[in-house]
Amino acid sequence: GIRAVDHAVETYLSIDANAYTDGACLQALRLLGEGLPRVKADPSDLDARLKCLMGAWMSMTGVITGSRLGASHAIGHILGGSAGVPHGHTSCIMLPYVLKWNESVNGARQKEVAIAMGRAGVPASDVLNDFICGLDMPRTIRETGVEEDDLPRLAENCMLDDWTFSNPREIRSPDQVMEILRMAW
């Protein structure tokens, strides 16, 4: 599902991206962008399920070849491990906000994400937000039952996750993580 979309997006935008991972991840986004809404509409649609299966498999190309991911995954690890938010939900919540926060450093590549998702000319953060909303998945941290008072502790804990430091836009302090968490609140 959206976890695979998150893998594809963060691999494509990774500081370790390369021609091999780029091709696999953009194709994964095309497949998932078509397949996921179709499966939601008709769970018995086997062609749509195959597209999702292939997209999910291709989305892992970067991870299995050593590409480091970014803040969506890093924050997601902490939301899951420290606050009990299901792993798939962390991607639904964090990915669009991380894209928006990172746009100043990888906006051109984010345009390719939007194109792969079939929405050229729309900011990737909006494309993913709309896509996730269309699947009726959670979009804010608030929806998960996490308390706002917990955000500073979660931001501190994010500094313990290696992928915080491989985010395309440099993160070096909990205050920067708090900027993203507040967007997602």
PLM features: residue spans?
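Active-site segments that bind and position negatively charged phosphate/pyrophosphate groups
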Residues: 11-127
